[in-house]
């Protein structure tokens, strides 16, 4: 009889893929099977995020709840970025935790499960060529890591301290994984990296003469691959070659995440982002011109230390010019180990909240206009999900979530849908037979 695994994943798509790797390792090597019922689990894992303070607080509230809900003899493990930066502190604050496994140490999961009070948080551990077992949360798409770690050292970001330096995964391994996924029915390939379009700058073994644009072309040539998505690219590496391949390759989905963070060049310099307001606008507006149907999402931090009212207005100006389809916006959150946490000119919470509210309110107005403009458009939709309220949903080529009436027979297929009732979260439509 197999043992039961309950796993909760917080944070980014990289964490989702790490959790898939953990599930594969434990199911194939330790005979675990997944359960959604925490009370029957023999092993309870939480894969954590530490980009902001809130997910760190959530970790300790969640593991406390796990301890109360778990059955006798069940183990609790903490994985991911918070595990990397807190390490043994987790044992002190939650002594009922059985092991701590950092984000760069996923391949050690079987050892962790079988070793009392195991801890491994080595951010220099190299997993770029480790052959993980295969598990996909969805049969219709496959998340695939193309690099690990981050070299950028942005002053507000803890990720380089939890995931280590950037290493590209050999292209031969990536292509084999894509081929395997496509043969098993995954028509959409989702490429992952902290700076995904910096791919090819450094390998741990044999160096390759390849960049991200080249890799995209190679993946698009694999039989069975119909759609390619990726996250998260860095604006600094969006050269003309990259934009041209993105625009002209018919298998690359026309949605681009462009993390702005701030629209002010001085603030960007303090953040160590490596680009200016002018560079960002040039890339974004050129992309809009080259690819009119593209949807652009972004990340924005308001109230970074020292940000003046006028500097915040530059962020609002970029919002007006680019008109992002989606924004992920936050008040600046000081993170341990980061340079910005030591800056003396921190912004008070009242000012930060006012700026965030203004930004989000204006984007809501822009989004309403964007959504309304989708009425009567016809999209090719790749259906992946049965909805609780009936019908099936999937993504358009430019990343709108579309729902139509239909059954599970539509899952894993691409169909044309005409938008009849566009809403912010979902565009409701009708199949075009």
Swiss-Prot record:
Question: Among its keywords, does the record have Transmembrane helix?
Answer: no
Q: Which domain of life is it from?
A: Bacteria
| Cofactors (names) | [4Fe-4S] cluster
Q: Where in the cell is it found?
A: Cytoplasm
Annotated [4Fe-4S] cluster 1 binding sites: 12, 49, 81
State a single Gene Ontology molecular function. Answer: 4 iron, 4 sulfur cluster binding
Which SMART domains does the annotation name?
Elp3
As its record notes, the protein acts as a catalyst of: N(6)-dimethylallyladenosine(37) in tRNA + (sulfur carrier)-SH + AH2 + 2 S-adenosyl-L-methionine = 2-methylsulfanyl-N(6)-dimethylallyladenosine(37) in tRNA + (sulfur carrier)-H + 5'-deoxyadenosine + L-methionine + A + S-adenosyl-L-homocysteine + 2 H(+)
- List each copy of the Radical SAM core domain by range: 136-369
How many cofactors are bound and how? Binds 2 [4Fe-4S] clusters. One cluster is coordinated with 3 cysteines and an exchangeable S-adenosyl-L-methionine.
Query: What is the E.C. number?
Result: 2.8.4.3
InterPro entries in the cross-refs: Elp3/MiaA/NifB-like_rSAM (IPR006638), Methylthiotransferase (IPR005839), Methylthiotransferase_CS (IPR020612), Methylthiotransferase_N (IPR013848), Methylthiotransferase_N_sf (IPR038135), MiaB_methiolase (IPR006463), rSAM (IPR007197), rSAM_horseshoe (IPR023404)
Taken from the UniProt entry, a GO cellular component term is: cytosol
Residues the record lists as binding [4Fe-4S] cluster 2: 150, 154, 157
User: Where is the TRAM domain positioned along the sequence?
Assistant: 372-433
Listed A to Z, the keywords are: 4Fe-4S, Cytoplasm, Iron, Iron-sulfur, Metal-binding, S-adenosyl-L-methionine, Transferase, tRNA processing
Instruction: Describe the location of the MTTase N-terminal domain by residue ranges.
Output: 3-118
What does the sequence similarity comment in the record state about its family? Belongs to the methylthiotransferase family. MiaB subfamily.
Q: What does this protein do?
A: Catalyzes the methylthiolation of N6-(dimethylallyl)adenosine (i(6)A), leading to the formation of 2-methylthio-N6-(dimethylallyl)adenosine (ms(2)i(6)A) at position 37 in tRNAs that read codons beginning with uridine.
Q: How does it assemble?
A: Monomer.
Write the protein's name: tRNA-2-methylthio-N(6)-dimethylallyladenosine synthase
Q: Taxonomic classification, please?
A: Bacteria, Pseudomonadati, Campylobacterota, Epsilonproteobacteria, Campylobacterales
| Gene from which the chain derives | miaB
